Curated annotation (Swiss-Prot):
GO terms under cellular component: cytosolic small ribosomal subunit
Annotated PROSITE patterns: RIBOSOMAL_S9
Source superkingdom: Bacteria
Protein family according to the UniProt entry: Belongs to the universal ribosomal protein uS9 family.
HAMAP family attached to this UniProt entry: Ribosomal_uS9_B
SUPFAM superfamilies found in the cross-reference section: Ribosomal protein S5 domain 2-like
Protein name per its UniProtKB record: Small ribosomal subunit protein uS9
One biological process term in Gene Ontology: translation
Recorded name of the encoding gene: rpsI
InterPro entries recorded: Ribosomal_Su5_D2-typ_SF, Ribosomal_uS9, Ribosomal_uS9_bac/plastid, Ribosomal_uS9_CS, Ribsml_uS5_D2-typ_fold_subgr
Length: 161
């Protein structure tokens, strides 16, 4: 901040100019050469790479339809949540490659990546998705096993006599 030497300096500093550091960030659309939005999502050990483009709602996961990859309806519901919050069901074609972890972690990773990709395609969706917590990386991972114990916290069986 500049030092004020006179009343004129004070008047110049109070002209209403806004400090750029205090302004709200402006989010712009981020698309690749094919007009797709790309984002990565993570959950536990799973990492999902998600591409979205305008279409009729086709969801492909690891080159397979979503109905065959996520056979359990609960996992498909997790995947659909960001689209329902945004009101964009069946408006985007979604292509996903996901690796690592189990099916539940992979579904959470796809949801995280899809939420981020939606905000890259339509920045005005950031507020409702952030309010629901879909843009936040779930940091909970498996606690490591400790030596001298059977698992992370479980002790070996103890016999008194």
């Amino acid at each position: 901040m500049a030092t004020l030497q006179s009343l004129a300096d004070l008047n110049r500093s109070n002209t209403g100019a806004v400090d750029p550091a205090n302004e709200a960030p402006v989010h712009v659309q981020k698309l690749d050469a094919q007009g797709r939005a790309y984002a990565t999502g993570k959950r536990k050990d799973a990492v999902a790479r998600v591409w979205i483009k305008p279409g009729n709602g086709t969801v492909t996961i690891n080159k397979r339809p979503v109905e065959t990859y996520f056979a359990r309806p609960v996992l498909r519901m997790i995947l659909r949540q960001p689209l329902e919050i945004a009101g964009r069901v069946d408006q985007y074609d979604i292509t996903v490659t996901v690796a690592g972890g189990g099916l539940s972690g992979q579904a959470g990773a796809v949801r995280h990546g899809l939420s981020k990709a939606l905000t890259y395609y339509e920045p005005e969706l950031r507020a409702p998705l952030k309010r629901e917590g879909f843009l936040t990386r779930d940091a909970r991972v498996v606690e490591r096993k400790k030596y001298g114990r059977k698992k992370a916290r479980r002790s070996f069986q103890f016999s008194k006599r």
